[in-house]
Amino acid sequence: MRILVAMSGGVDSSVVAALLKRQGHEVIGATLQLYDHGQAAKPGACCAGRDIMDARAVADRLGFPHYVIDAESRFRDSVVESFADAYARGETPVPCVACNQGVKFTDLLGMARDLGCEAMATGHYVRRVEGPEGAEMHRPVDAERDQTWFLFATTKDQLDYLRFPLGEMPDKAHVRALAQELGLEIAAKPDSQDICFVPSGSYAELVEKLRPEVRGEGEIVDEDGRVLGRHEGVARYTVGQSKRLGDIHTATGERQMVTRIDVPKRRIVVGPRVQVSEADSRRSVRLRDMNWLIDAPAEGVRCGVQIRAREKLREALVKPLENGGALVELTEAAMPAPGQACVLYDGSRVLGGGFITAGDA
């Protein structure tokens, strides 16, 4: 089988390419150049100069062709600019979802089909299972590396074409051992970080540079509008966090957390953590840009939902809406952050997902 492998220059995708080559497949490697702002030597970067060289070195050693696609413009528009826009609205975006769906899968899947490939493989920790009605997305064996939450926007057609060989791997140590066994020099290379395109490591500095209107101090207030302190910029906060609130914890005698971000007024609204679950949380949440990996059930579906990348599942009834969104009715109140993903699960299977909106349901 002719398979295109999306190669980031890291251990995971390199092992995927090597395994498929060893299995006798005709492998073609491809890497997207997403940016180049001195990232070649930055630990945790992805798809920059050094990574492209590492991917090409693997392809040369194993003897298969490797292509580089210049996707800087699309990446800047689809990921970086939208990332800054979201924070300027008081949301907490998930850039990895935008990158996977708006850049990587768009460009690489198109290239794979143009090259006559029968499938495209990636180094994501996801299981693809052939179900009675077609391909299904499931959590991987290695729960610590689960990336299904970040791939909820993968469409049915894309899932049919994609392959995820690492979904059955027991852990990352096993993958690194395979890399050594396969003779890959990058076996000990560090993993990429969550926000790989932030050169300084401070996402807030990037947002403030791209959207100067969010710069500047403002007030930290309680739900009654009483001023409790000052903050250094609204882009530095997200709903649910309790860090960077200064001495407010000791001033009030109760540990506080962010409940709302009022961008026009430059206000961070906080409330006591012990009371937030009842006073400021929500049992109903609206989602936008819903992607279903099952036939959208008109009457709704009872399932588990995950409203943050590393949070527990919550029981809910999810109903499709005519505007392409969905209404999530939680059995227990939660503090969803606008802009984050809400992903639906039935056991290990991903049913779909969408983005949390700021409006009340």
From Swiss-Prot:
This is tRNA-specific 2-thiouridylase MnmA. The gene is mnmA. One of its GO terms (molecular function) is tRNA-uridine 2-sulfurtransferase activity. InterPro entries: MnmA-like (IPR004506), MnmA-like_C (IPR046885), MnmA-like_central (IPR046884), MnmA-like_central_sf (IPR023382), Rossmann-like_a/b/a_fold (IPR014729). The record marks H124, Q340 as: Interaction with tRNA. It catalyses: S-sulfanyl-L-cysteinyl-[protein] + uridine(34) in tRNA + AH2 + ATP = 2-thiouridine(34) in tRNA + L-cysteinyl-[protein] + A + AMP + diphosphate + H(+). Gene3D superfamilies: Adenine nucleotide alpha hydrolases-like domains, HUPs, Translation factors. GO terms for biological process: tRNA wobble position uridine thiolation. Keywords: ATP-binding, Cytoplasm, Disulfide bond, Nucleotide-binding, RNA-binding, Transferase, tRNA processing, tRNA-binding. The keyword tRNA-binding applies. The keyword Chloroplast does not apply. Belongs to the MnmA/TRMU family. SUPFAM superfamilies: Adenine nucleotide alpha hydrolases-like. Pfam families: tRNA_Me_trans, tRNA_Me_trans_C, tRNA_Me_trans_M.
